[in-house]
Every structure is written in C-alpha cells, then in structure tokens.
Amino acid sequence: MSTNSYYSSASSSGFRVCPPGVPSKCWCGEEIITFTSKTKENPYRRFYRCAIAMKRENEEHLFKWVDEALLDEIKMVNEKCKRVVENISDLRMNVMANMELLNKNAKQMEEELIKKMEGELLTMKENVEELGHVMAKSALKTVGVAVVIVASIVWLWGRV
C-alpha cells in the first residue's frame, strides 16, 4: 500500500460497509491505498481508500480509517486468542481424562498380573513339592529294588 495525501471529510458511515480488520482490496477488486486526511475535522488521520474511488467519486468504494481498521484487527486477534485458549483448555481436560483412564487401566493390569503370577507361583510350588514326594518315593523304590537284587545275589552266591 502506498501513502498519499487526500482531502477527505468523509466518515466511514457514508460509504459501503467494509470488511472487519485491515482491508487488502476493495469490493471492486482494486488495491487499497493509504491516504492522510487534511481536513479540519480529521487532520493527519490516516485512512484506506480504493484507487478507483478517486476517479469515480459517485460510486461507493472502500473507505476505512486506519485506526478503526487496526482496532477491528486487534478485536479479531483477541477473539481468536480466546478461542485458542478455550481449545487448549478443552484439549488439556481431554488429555487429563485420558491420562487418568490410562493410569486406572495400568493399575488394573498390574493387579491382574500380580494375581496371575501369584497363582502361577503357588502352582509351581505345589508341583515342586509333589515332584519332591514322587522323587522320594522313587528313591525308596530304587533302594528297595537294589536291596532285593543284592539280597538275591548274596543268596545265589551262597548257594553256589
């Protein structure tokens, strides 16, 4: 945008409705130029104006005070910031809820694994004890069979 001097006593209410914020183009598609007012009512006040408006004064082309446009822009940015803060708050709440759910599930899985491991450990302990008894019985049987064999050999030796 360029800056020019322009004699203007127009107010924003006398022209076509402008889009909020800082305009980039007029409704007709022309670029916007920044001018400085030289009127007694608005001395050195800057405004945006369509380049064609200078040539076609009977048509209603874009006119907007720079300070009003900047205020509109600030208001829009503030509203966007509020929406971003709300979105972040919502996101934070969702993340916290998910974290609580994950912690609850992790604790539940840990408890289930501990119970399962305790059950397996008890089963293994019982199996080891049973195996010990079986091995003890087996050892007694082996000793008994060995005694019978030795006694048979001694008896047979004695008969020979």
Curated annotation (Swiss-Prot):
Keyword entries, A-Z: Metal-binding, Zinc, Zinc-finger
Keyword Metal-binding: yes
Key word Manganese present: no
A molecular function GO annotation: zinc ion binding
Residues that hold Zn(2+) according to the record: C26, C28, C50, H61
Annotated zinc fingers (GRF-type), start-end: 26-69
Name by which UniProt lists this protein: Uncharacterized protein At4g04775
